[in-house]
């Protein structure tokens, strides 16, 4: 991040203060204990399984198929080259800022999230994913890109994909499960295409600029919703009895305030990395100030899980950027509490009252989850090994047998949903995938600098932050959040490969 003169002054004053020295002495025993934890030592070990996976039969088959496709495109390109070499389309695309792969990919991702819910169709993402994959392979075949084999995304990624496909065998409603599997396939393609195509910080800059634009546009629209009273207090979204005075919760272009909060938690750290690494100090400050808009929008969602997730993401971001600023971060967070509007304080206190019952009334959303999870526990007991298949239809076919809460369409927890839908294999492979991704990002940041380093920190922060929301929300029920999650994963892989180029090298 670009620190100005004033910020540098306060920073130096802080790290040389007596109070900071005392905090360092208090922290040192905890740091030593952390370094000696068995789990930490395990995460720091090398990845032997990946080496075995890359030489496996499955990996060789996938490479063979991709090589055949690329050779086919290469032959077609060679045959047609004389005809289109001087064509108008080629002349327009050559050197164009707009008519190139990165611009089109970023523009679609931006459009995906700024399009209002009533106009969006998940089929757009499926068609776009297939189109971008085809275009990428054409570029590889014509020699414009270097092919990245899917095994570079890691064995856990492939294992999770296999678990999703195998879940079809045990599905309670195969047609609906197939529909959801198509959404996952599109999400995986976005991950692969982003990881494969992004080769340098300049390309990442383009993509992040579009993501920043999407976050800003949706934030401004959310503020407009509140300003012009386009949203109203809804008893189905908020317990109005203990949340008195809470206004309507903004949804922006998404369908639900929690969905929008999850989108912001996933992408705001990326926006912070994008803004904070601008070389021009004026643009850096302007872009950082712009983050006030999505922060305000997140507050207006009144999503308690979203608030906690973003605070956790911010804590991780500061931790990985500069641990010495952690006490200052905590102090500023505590000092901000007295200045919070009463409606926000009311909403935050319901977190405590929901679990302790100190107000004599448990929040209806918390009560709903507790009752639902009790029934889900029995469903997992009976179907947790193989799963019941993807999609709400499979859940709906079994839920009446377990006396679940009326109107429940999913488990209200990402982790419960993964076990129930995909079984143990799906849950373990997903957790392995994300933990490995976080581990690789933290390690890779030590070798990176500039935008790539900031981005690795931001991706780690986003994944850790959203992990809290996964406890009390099923993020992927709304497909655009599913796409956002795996777009973030693709950006993470791309940044890891840039920090460690040999990890992306083809065999």
Give residue spans per PLM region:
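Transmembrane signal-anchor hairpin modules in multi-pass inner-membrane enzymes, especially those
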Residues: 1-166, 172-176, 202-205, 209, ...
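Transmembrane alpha-helices of multi-pass inner-membrane enzymes
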Residues: 130-135, 436, 451, 459-507
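Structural signal for the C-terminal ends of transmembrane alpha-helices
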Residues: 134-146, 193-202, 272-279, 315-323, ...
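Hydrophobic core segments of transmembrane alpha-helices in multi-pass, intramembrane catalytic enzymes
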Residues: 124-134, 179-191, 258-274, 305-317, ...
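Alpha-helical transmembrane segments of multi-pass inner-membrane proteins
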Residues: 108-109, 162-166, 189, 205-246, ...
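Aromatic-anchored transmembrane helix interface
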Residues: 152-160, 174-196, 205-215, 262
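Long extracytoplasmic/lumenal interhelical loops at the membrane interface
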Residues: 232, 246, 359-374, 378, ...
């Amino acid at each position: 991040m670009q620190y100005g003169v004033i910020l540098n002054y306060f920073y130096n004053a802080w790290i040389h203060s007596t109070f900071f020295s005392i905090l360092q002495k208090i922290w040192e025993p905890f740091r030593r204990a952390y370094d000696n934890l068995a789990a930490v030592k395990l995460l720091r070990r090398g990845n032997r399984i990946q080496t075995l996976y890359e030489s496996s039969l499955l990996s060789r088959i996938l490479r063979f198929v991709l090589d055949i496709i690329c050779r086919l495109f290469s032959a077609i390109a060679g045959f047609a080259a004389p005809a289109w070499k001087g064509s108008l389309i080629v002349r327009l695309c050559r050197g164009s800022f707009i008519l190139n792969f990165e611009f089109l990919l970023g523009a679609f991702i931006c459009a995906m999230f700024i399009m209002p819910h009533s106009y969006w169709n998940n089929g757009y993402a499926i068609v776009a994913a297939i189109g971008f994959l085809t275009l990428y392979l054409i570029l590889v075949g014509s020699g414009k890109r270097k092919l990245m084999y899917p095994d570079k995304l890691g064995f856990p990624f492939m294992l999770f994909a296999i678990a999703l496909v195998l879940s079809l065998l045990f599905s309670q409603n195969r047609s609906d499960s197939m529909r959801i599997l198509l959404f996952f396939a599109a999400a995986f393609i976005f991950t692969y295409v982003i990881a494969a195509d992004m080769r340098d910080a300049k390309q990442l800059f383009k993509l992040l600029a579009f993501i920043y634009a999407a976050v800003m546009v949706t934030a401004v629209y959310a503020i407009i919703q509140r300003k012009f009273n386009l949203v109203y207090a809804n008893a189905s979204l908020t317990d109005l009895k203990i949340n008195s005075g809470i206004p309507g919760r903004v949804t922006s272009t998404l369908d639900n305030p929690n969905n929008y909060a999850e989108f912001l938690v996933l992408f705001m750290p990326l926006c912070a990395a994008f803004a904070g690494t601008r070389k021009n100090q004026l643009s850096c400050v302007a872009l950082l100030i712009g983050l006030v808009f999505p922060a305000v929008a997140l507050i207006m969602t009144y999503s308690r899980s979203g608030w906690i997730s973003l605070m956790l993401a911010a804590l991780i971001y500061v931790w990985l950027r500069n641990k010495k600023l952690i006490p200052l971060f905590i102090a500023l967070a505590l000092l901000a509490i007295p200045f919070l509007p009463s409606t926000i304080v009311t909403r935050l206190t319901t977190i405590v009252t929901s679990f302790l019952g100190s107000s004599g009334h448990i929040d209806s959303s918390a009560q709903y989850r507790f009752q639902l999870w009790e029934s889900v526990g029995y469903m997992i007991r009976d179907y947790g090994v193989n799963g019941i298949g993807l999609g709400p239809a499979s859940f709906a076919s079994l839920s009446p047998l377990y006396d679940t809460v009326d109107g429940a369409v999913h488990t209200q927890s990402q982790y419960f949903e993964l076990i129930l839908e995909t079984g143990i294999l799906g849950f373990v492979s997903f957790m392995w995938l994300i933990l490995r991704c976080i581990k690789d990002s933290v390690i890779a940041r030590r070798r990176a600098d500039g935008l790539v380093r900031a981005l690795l920190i931001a991706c780690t922060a986003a994944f850790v932050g959203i992990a809290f929301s996964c406890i009390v929300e099923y993020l992927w029920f709304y497909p655009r959040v599913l796409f956002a999650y795996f777009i973030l994963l693709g950006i993470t892989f791309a940044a890891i490969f840039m920090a460690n180029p040999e990890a992306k090298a083809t065999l």
